[in-house]
Amino acid sequence: MTPILAAEALTYAFPGGVKALDDLSLAVPQGESLAILGPNGAGKSTLLLHLNGTLRPQSGRVLLGGTATGHSRKDLTDWRRRVGLVLQDADDQLFAATVFEDVSFGPLNLGLSEAEARARVEEALAALSISDLRDRPTHMLSGGQKRRVAIAGAVAMRPEVLLLDEPTAGLDLAGTEQLLTLLHGLRAAGMTLVFSTHDVELAAALADRVALFRTGRVLAEGAAAAVLSDRATLAQGGLRPPLVIDLALSRARSRPFGPRSALPRTRDALAAQMAGWTRR
């Protein structure tokens, strides 16, 4: 099946010659959740900015639905309608006076009628469980609320792919769990998710697939359980397996565990397997 979004041999260097992306290729399967995992400075955010057309590669190309993208005004408008982006700092994304006005901006700029734009906004606010915030001034929102409003603004465009840069940055535990529930809901509704993170626990909880980055290159890419259980490769990126996978791997040293695909990736899955261990 043709990937919904793909990067082919992307290279991009900042002024001074430091390469953020170094001949990087990556495919995003439709309907899946892909984690772009790696330490700070690995090129994760730079890739996302290429995947929605904000940055133009110095070499290589981005394909959307198998077709090479262009950077004309018309091409970019269509591209950003199909591929939404939520920035790491929601304050960089919110600019209207109220939540409703902010979420309305994208649909209105698509040329939709006021009635259709309003319907999309109401739908997005409901999907993100923030309908009660519709008239709230954006500067009076909490960090978690701002993040959800920024996501609602992208969702209101009805994109095929949603890109999220460090989606849980700055959120407390409760805010992170609420956001995970919302993102799982978008994923279950068929939206393709691509998110950058340095948090292996988040990658385990949300991703179907993981691409491990280091200095603008892909070190490893594959099913989440396989990549997140590969200690040696994770160490090259300055990371280690998530706690739930680490505990399961430790158990497997004394008793065969089974295929890596069966490794638990959430606390609930680990608890269920631990209950099975005590019965054996």
Curated annotation (Swiss-Prot):
Task: Give the metabolic or biological pathway.
Answer: Cofactor biosynthesis; adenosylcobalamin biosynthesis
Pfam families hit by this protein: ABC_tran (PF00005)
What are the GO BP annotations of this UniProt entry?
A: cobalamin biosynthetic process; cobalt ion transport
List localization entries: Cell inner membrane
- Identify which top EC class this enzyme belongs to: translocase
| Chain residues that bind ATP | 38-45
The record's listing under Gene3D superfamilies reads: P-loop containing nucleotide triphosphate hydrolases
Alphabetically, the GO molecular function entries are: ATP binding; ATP hydrolysis activity; ATPase-coupled transmembrane transporter activity
Cellular component per GO, a single term: ATP-binding cassette (ABC) transporter complex
What EC number is given for this enzyme?
Answer: 7.2.2.-
Which SMART domains has this protein been placed in?
AAA
Instruction: Tell me which residues make up the ABC transporter domain.
Output: 5-240
The keyword ATP-binding appears for this protein: yes
| Annotated InterPro entries | AAA+_ATPase, ABC_transporter-like_ATP-bd, ABC_transporter-like_CS, ABC_transpr_CbiO/EcfA_su, Co_trans_ATP-bd, ECF_ABC_transporter_ATP-bd, P-loop_NTPase
Membrane topology reported for the UniProt record? Peripheral membrane protein
Per UniProt, the keywords (alphabetical) are: ATP-binding, Cell inner membrane, Cell membrane, Cobalamin biosynthesis, Cobalt, Cobalt transport, Ion transport, Membrane, Nucleotide-binding, Translocase, Transport
Family per similarity comment? Belongs to the ABC transporter superfamily.
Quote the function comment for this protein: Part of the energy-coupling factor (ECF) transporter complex CbiMNOQ involved in cobalt import. The complex confers cobalt uptake upon expression in E.coli; can also transport nickel with a very low affinity. Presumably responsible for energy coupling to the transport system.
Q: How does it assemble?
A: Forms an energy-coupling factor (ECF) transporter complex composed of an ATP-binding protein (A component, CbiO), a transmembrane protein (T component, CbiQ) and 2 possible substrate-capture proteins (S components, CbiM and CbiN) of unknown stoichimetry. Subcomplexes composed of CbiMQO can be isolated from membranes but the CbiN subunit is not isolated in association with them, suggesting it is only loosely associated. Expression of just CbiMN in E.coli confers some cobalt uptake.
Q: Please identify the protein, giving its name as recorded.
A: Cobalt import ATP-binding protein CbiO
Gene name, please? cbiO
